[in-house]
């Protein structure tokens, strides 16, 4: 009799995705982040569900409902901090996953890559709206500043902002709709993840060498299931260390002050995972220009496949491109640091130079260096 996992309509899908899936024999730990992102998503949905049971999306009670979760709900504190720090772990895994795609040329799977960009944008939107919900000072002013950026859109800008706010300022209507969207978006993310995997399984995984691995495949289970479990244990261990020992390490102290429309915090800044984009936004003195640069800093990923000029797929055998890639990583870390600093000399000029370098590396240097490497190898 044939095994039920190979015949049952539902079990068959799981079997072909997680058990009998042919996988390259040489994929490294950089290929672990996909499964880690899946674990992060499940964790966030579960902790978020339990938080939503006790949270009230109302300007008068939102802040105190979060305090109530931490003080009065059984294990509410750990659920809240797992959710808050889970978002940070989510973005660490996301950036590593995207970085891996850039380094090893995984973006040549254009459908998978494009769905990945949509996923990234959706997750960023979800995280932004989630940050507004505790209704602390940074929640309120972060929401005000970021939504206000849309007013830079010519002609319809102001109307658009007021439409999103549901009034003339960030208020009760804004909080309620942000809660509704924050709840629904992770399920949309889950659906997009299924599409992401669907496209990936059409082609199979890339591997560090960038050479087709059809002649040397191994079953996903047990080799990569055990490898994924190791990654998951490390992820959960780091998350628990964060949540239990220093839960507020990555947060902003201002968010422990209830939202007050009459007092602006001295330094308005988003969560650490948005600081690089925030630094790019602030580098341009013009409002519309800043908003465009902010959008392009993420959307530039969409044209990366068009800028691939190398005859090789990944960077494994391209040392000059490797140097450029790590320069890009250092540049992004610099931007992250600048995003958290006040707008004053020397931070302004450092941010501007780092922003220019970011776009120059991706749009100019990478394609040119790839062509030079081709000629060095006489290809």
Swiss-Prot record:
Keywords: Electron transport, Heme, Iron, Membrane, Metal-binding, Mitochondrion, Mitochondrion inner membrane, Respiratory chain, Transmembrane, Transmembrane helix, Transport, Ubiquinone. Binds 2 heme b groups non-covalently. The chain crosses the membrane at residues 33-53, 77-98, 113-133, 178-198, 226-246, 288-308, 320-340, 347-367. Disulfide bonds: none annotated. A ubiquinone binds at residue 201. Its cofactor is heme b. GO terms for cellular component: mitochondrial inner membrane; respiratory chain complex III. The keyword Metal-binding applies. GO terms for biological process: mitochondrial electron transport, ubiquinol to cytochrome c. Heme b b566 binds at residues 97, 196. Its main location: mitochondrion. It comes from the Eukaryota. Signal peptide: none annotated. GO terms for molecular function: metal ion binding; ubiquinol-cytochrome-c reductase activity. Heme b b562 binds at residues 83, 182. It is a multi-pass membrane protein. It holds the Pfam family Cytochrome_B. The keyword GTP-binding does not apply. Belongs to the cytochrome b family. Component of the ubiquinol-cytochrome c reductase complex (complex III or cytochrome b-c1 complex) that is part of the mitochondrial respiratory chain. The b-c1 complex mediates electron transfer from ubiquinol to cytochrome c. Contributes to the generation of a proton gradient across the mitochondrial membrane that is then used for ATP synthesis. Heme 1 (or BL or b562) is low-potential and absorbs at about 562 nm, and heme 2 (or BH or b566) is high-potential and absorbs at about 566 nm. The cytochrome bc1 complex contains 11 subunits: 3 respiratory subunits (MT-CYB, CYC1 and UQCRFS1), 2 core proteins (UQCRC1 and UQCRC2) and 6 low-molecular weight proteins (UQCRH/QCR6, UQCRB/QCR7, UQCRQ/QCR8, UQCR10/QCR9, UQCR11/QCR10 and a cleavage product of UQCRFS1). This cytochrome bc1 complex then forms a dimer. This is Cytochrome b. The gene is MT-CYB.
């Amino acid at each position: 009799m044939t095994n039920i996992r190979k015949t049952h309509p539902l079990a068959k899908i799981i079997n072909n995705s997680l058990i009998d899936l042919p996988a390259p024999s040489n994929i490294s730990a950089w290929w672990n982040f996909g499964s880690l992102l899946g674990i992060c998503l499940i964790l966030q949905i579960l902790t978020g569900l339990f938080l939503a049971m006790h949270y009230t999306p109302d300007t008068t009670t939102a802040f105190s409902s979060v305090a109530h979760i931490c003080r009065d709900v059984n294990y509410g504190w750990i659920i809240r901090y797992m959710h808050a720090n889970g978002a940070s772990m989510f973005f660490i895994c996301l950036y590593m996953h995207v970085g891996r795609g850039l380094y090893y040329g995984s973006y040549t799977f254009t459908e998978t890559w494009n769905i990945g960009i949509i996923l990234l944008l959706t997750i960023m939107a979800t995280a932004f709206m989630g940050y507004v919900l505790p209704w602390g000072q940074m929640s309120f002013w972060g929401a005000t500043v970021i939504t206000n950026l849309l007013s830079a859109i010519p002609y319809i800008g102001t109307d658009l902002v007021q439409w999103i706010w549901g009034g003339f300022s960030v208020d009760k209507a804004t909080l309620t709709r942000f809660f509704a969207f924050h709840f629904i978006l992770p399920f949309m993310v889950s659906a997009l993840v299924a599409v992401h995997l669907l496209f990936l399984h059409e082609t199979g995984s890339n591997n560090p060498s960038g050479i087709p691995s059809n002649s040397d495949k191994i079953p996903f289970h047990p080799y990569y299931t055990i490898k994924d479990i190791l990654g998951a244990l490390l992820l959960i261990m780091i998350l628990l260390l964060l949540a239990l020992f220093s839960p507020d390490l990555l947060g902003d102290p201002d968010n422990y002050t209830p939202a007050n429309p009459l007092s602006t915090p001295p330094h308005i800044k988003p969560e650490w995972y948005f600081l690089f984009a925030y630094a790019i936004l602030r580098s341009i003195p013009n409002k519309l220009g800043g908003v465009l640069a902010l959008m392009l800093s993420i959307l530039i990923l969409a044209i990366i496949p068009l800028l691939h000029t190398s005859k090789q797929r990944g960077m494994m055998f391209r040392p000059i491109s490797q140097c450029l890639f790590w320069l890009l990583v250092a540049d992004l870390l610099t931007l992250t640091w600048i995003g958290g600093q006040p707008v004053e000399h020397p931070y302004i000029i450092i941010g501007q130079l780092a922003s220019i370098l970011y776009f120059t590396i991706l749009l100019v240097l990478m394609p040119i260096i790839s062509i030079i490497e081709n000629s060095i190898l006489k290809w």
